[in-house]
């Protein structure tokens, strides 16, 4: 632990000092300790408000920082500062990088691989969840680290897809690390910590304030070589992430959607505006920087199969009943078990055996209410 860690944490905790002001003060004074030692007049000349100056010159802020360090230890978390070697190189390049990153898990290990942000709507379709899980699973299995925001919908699906392939995933959250949001993602968060990292720029006890979530999006894109958008409405925060990615010189990818769906507006607009259309994992991998491809595959790109277009579904090793069910199911509209019983003209035991076999082969997924959907 660096000797001046409390100074960095304290500067990050001062109300009225965001990343832009903090970076300016550090460039002006050289270190957090020098900022705290500056005179009131000098700080006034920097344009700081009286209440911010008062907090900077109140010794209690350092007491709070030291208490924060004790809480970090209990949480098995760490803070990486802008001056630390462990600070992510790509993130350091962006405008207004966070001066301190709160981390649970192994961020360094997760970022040894090229990272891709996968984001989208919280209110997404079943198809969107299916696509997010499938693409994230395939990308993680080919060596990419999946970065998302731990939110409901597409974010959670992206994390789960990466975890299904035993891949690495990073959650960039809009709360302090002592708070899980949403609360039902506590188990998912712990799985991410065990297979990647959870990252925040906010002090430990920060609640899920609405303004925090668009604010953290620059970190989502800043950690990655590119951003993939899967379902986003016209006013979705995912479009903020895409804009930030463009500003940061990152690649922007999008999965096209149904033109009549509100959640397809974002990706369809981005594709029209020049984002790269994604249908399969290779569409992303082909855009990796050369050095990243060589690191992952030992060659410029992964070896191609005989056909460059792979079938999404293969009917190998399936029983006649399983094939029949797969033909009935779709990837976007769930089918209730009663509907399958009628459409398949199978008896109940045969239908249950077919569904069980398809689930074990990871070809379908059961949804709440005894409904089923085909996996991509």
Language-model features, listed with the residues they occupy:
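Glycine-biased, small-residue-rich flexible motifs in mid-sequence functional cores and linkers
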Residues: 1-4, 73, 81-376
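Short, small/acidic-rich helices and loops at N termini and domain boundaries
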Residues: 1-85, 361-363, 368-370, 375-376
């Amino acid at each position: 632990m660096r000797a001046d860690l409390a100074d960095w944490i304290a500067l990050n905790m001062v109300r009225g000092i965001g990343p832009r002001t903090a970076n300016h003060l550090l460039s002006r004074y050289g270190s957090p300790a020098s900022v705290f030692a500056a005179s009131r007049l000098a700080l006034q000349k920097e344009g700081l408000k009286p209440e911010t100056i008062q907090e900077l010159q109140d010794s209690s802020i350092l007491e709070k920082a030291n208490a924060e360090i004790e809480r970090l230890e209990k949480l098995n978390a760490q803070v990486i500062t802008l001056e630390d070697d462990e600070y992510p190189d790509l993130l350091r390049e962006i405008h207004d990088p966070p001066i301190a990153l709160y981390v649970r898990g192994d961020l360094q290990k997760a970022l040894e691989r090229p990272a891709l942000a996968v984001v989208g709507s919280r209110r997404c379709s079943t198809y969107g969840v299916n696509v997010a899980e499938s693409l994230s699973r395939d990308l993680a299995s080919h060596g990419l680290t999946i970065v998302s925001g731990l939110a409901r919908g597409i974010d959670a699906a992206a994390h789960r897809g990466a975890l299904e392939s035993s891949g690495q995933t990073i959650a960039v959250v809009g709360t302090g690390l002592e708070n899980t949001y949403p609360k039902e993602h506590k188990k998912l968060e712990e799985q991410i910590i065990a297979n990647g990292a959870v990252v925040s720029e906010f002090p430990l006890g920060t609640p899920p304030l609405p303004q925090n979530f668009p604010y953290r999006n620059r970190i989502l894109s800043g950690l990655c070589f590119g951003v993939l958008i899967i379902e986003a409405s016209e006013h979705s925060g995912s479009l903020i992430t895409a804009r930030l990615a463009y500003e940061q010189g990152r690649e922007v990818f999008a999965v096209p959607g149904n033109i009549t769906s509100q959640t397809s507006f974002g990706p369809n607009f981005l594709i029209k505006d020049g984002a790269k259309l994604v249908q399969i994992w290779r569409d992303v991998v082909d855009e990796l920087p050369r050095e990243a491809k060589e690191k992952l595959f030992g060659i410029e790109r992964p070896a191609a199969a005989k056909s460059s277009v792979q079938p999404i579904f293969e009917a190998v090793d399936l029983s006649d009943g399983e094939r029949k069910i797969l033909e009935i199911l779709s990837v976007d509209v769930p089918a209730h078990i009663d509907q399958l019983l009628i459409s398949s003209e199978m008896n109940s035991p045969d239908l249950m055996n077919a569904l069980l076999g398809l689930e074990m082969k990871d070809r379908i997924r059961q949804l709440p209410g005894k409904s089923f959907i085909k996996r991509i």
